[in-house]
Amino acid sequence: MECDLMETDILESLEDLGYKGPLLEDGALSQAVSAGASSPEFTKLCAWLVSELRVLCKLEENVQATNSPSEAEEFQLEVSGLLGEMNCPYLSLTSGDVTKRLLIQKNCLLLLTYLISELEAARMLCVNAPPKKAQEGGGSEVFQELKGICIALGMSKPPANITMFQFFSGIEKKLKETLAKVPPNHVGKPLLKKPMGPAHWEKIEAINQAIANEYEVRRKLLIKRLDVTVQSFGWSDRAKSQTEKLAKVYQPKRSVLSPKTTISVAHLLAARQDLSKILRTSSGSIREKTACAINKVLMGRVPDRGGRPNEIEPPPPEMPPWQKRQDGPQQQTGGRGGGRGGYEHSSYGGRGGHEQGGGRGGRGGYDHGGRGGGRGNKHQGGWTDGGSGGGGGYQDGGYRDSGFQPGGYHGGHSSGGYQGGGYGGFQTSSSYTGSGYQGGGYQQDNRYQDGGHHGDRGGGRGGRGGRGGRGGRAGQGGGWGGRGSQNYHQGGQFEQHFQHGGYQYNHSGFGQGRHYTS
C-alpha cells in the first residue's frame, strides 16, 4: 500500500515537472522500479531528473542512462557519487552495498522521490530569484526568435558584423517578396493597426499574463474533471479487466493536454480582421456542422411545479378566527339552576339541577314542600295560605308549569321580602348577628312543624349570592328565605337555630312587627 501511494505521488509530480517519457503510462513505473537499476527505463528517468537539476544547480557529478542490465553496477556507482555530493539524508541510499542498493523497489521509489523534491525546490528558487537576462544577440530568447524568422523565410545566416538595422531591413525585403507570390487578400489586414510604444507593450504583457493565469486555473479544473471521469469508468467489475486497454488509449491523449496556455502577444500582432466577425451559433450555416441527433429529441411535457411568488397562497392562521358564540337549543321549561340547590332532610343540595323547573328557577332539590331553588316561577294566584308553597313551583303540593304570570302573589314583594298573607316578612339584620349562616348560609335540622313537612331549605346561598338568589321562598309564613334557614310555626313563632363559630342562638317570635304588603 505504501509503495502504491509513492508511485501515485511520483506520477503526479512528473507530470507537473513536464516529463513526457513512457513511464507515465499505467503500470510502466511499477514495472520499472521493480527491476531497479537493471531497468533501462528507470535509469533514463533518473538521468533526466539529474540533467534538469544540473541546469539549475552547480553539480559536478552526473548520471548516464544505461542500455542493458549489465550496466547496472556502473549506474549505481554514479548515483552514489551524486547523492554524496547532494548530502542525501536517506541512509538506505547512502549506506550498505553499493551494487545492491537500487535493486530494492522501495529504495528506487525513495530515490525518485528525493530527486523530484530537489528539482521542485530548485525551480522554486529559480523563480523567486531569476538569473540576469543575457544580452541581446547572444543565446537569449530574442536570438532564438530571430533565428526562427530567418529559417521560416528561407534566409541565409547573416554575417557577424551586420547591424540590427540592416538585419531587419533584410527581413522586411524578404517578407515583401514572399507576399508578392500570394493573392492580395490572402493574409488579410491586421486587426491591430495603432502603433504601440514601450509603455503600451508592458500593459499588454500584463493583461495577457492575467488572462493566462485565469485560464490556466480553468484548464486545470477541466483536466482534473476529465481524469476523475475516466477513472470512474474503471470502477465496474467489467471495466477492471480492461484497465490496460483504457490506459493505452487515454494516456497518449491525456499527455497532450497542458494547463499552460500557448497564447502570447505575438498572436495579437498576427490577428487579422477575419477574427472580428461575429457568427451566430444558431445560424443555419453553422448548425449544419454542429447539429447532432440528440438535438432532435424533444423533451416531454413537464408538469408545472409552481413556486411563483404571485401564486403562493398565504398560510392558514395559527388560531381560528373568532366567531360569535351560538346559543344552544332552548329547552321546554329550562332556565338557570335554582339557587344552589336545596336540602332534603337536612342535606346540602349542590347547585340544583334543571328538572323541569319553572321559569328561570330549577327544581332546586326539595322534598315536597321544601324550598324551591333559584328564582322559581311565580304561578298565578301567588302564594297559598298553608299550602306547601315551594319556590314558586308548587301549589298545594302540585306542580304547575306556568311561567312568570302577572298578578303576583298575595303578599306582593318588596325589596326586603315577601308577605304570604300572614306573618313573617323581612327579617332585619338587627335580629341576629353573625349573619345567621355558616360557610354558605344553610341551617341544619330545619323542620316545618305545622304539617310535618320537611321544609328543608332550598338554595343555600340562593341564586348567586346577594339576596339569597332572590328565590328562597317557602312556607306559609312567607318569610324571606335569605341567608340561613328559618323554621316557621303557623302560629307565628320562630324557633331558629343559627350556628356561627360554635355559638347557638334561640329566638322566639322576633321580628313580628314588620310586614310588607302590596
Swiss-Prot record:
Biased composition (Gly residues): 349-364, 383-396, 405-415, 460-484
GO cellular component, one term: nucleus
Tissue specificity field: Expressed strongly in colorectal cancer cells. Expressed strongly in colorectal cancer tissues compared to wild-type colon samples (at protein level). Expressed strongly in colorectal cancer tissues compared to wild-type colon samples.
Bias type Basic and acidic residues, positions: 302-311, 447-459
GO annotation terms (biological process): lysosome localization; positive regulation of cell population proliferation; positive regulation of gene expression; positive regulation of ruffle assembly; protein methylation; tRNA splicing, via endonucleolytic cleavage and ligation
Composition-biased stretches (Low complexity): 488-504
Pfam families referenced in this protein's UniProt entry, alphabetically: DUF2465
Composition bias type Polar residues, residue spans: 505-518
InterPro entries noted in UniProt: FAM98
Domain of life: Eukaryota
GO molecular function: protein methyltransferase activity; RNA binding
Region feature (Disordered): 297-415, 434-518
Family: Belongs to the FAM98 family.
Role summary: Positively stimulates PRMT1-induced protein arginine methylation. Involved in skeletal homeostasis. Positively regulates lysosome peripheral distribution and ruffled border formation in osteoclasts.
Complex formation: Interacts (via N- and C-terminus) with DDX1. Interacts (via N- and C-terminus) with C14orf166. Interacts with FAM98B. Interacts with PLEKHM1 (via N- and C-terminus).
Entry protein name: Protein FAM98A
Species in which this protein is naturally found: Homo sapiens
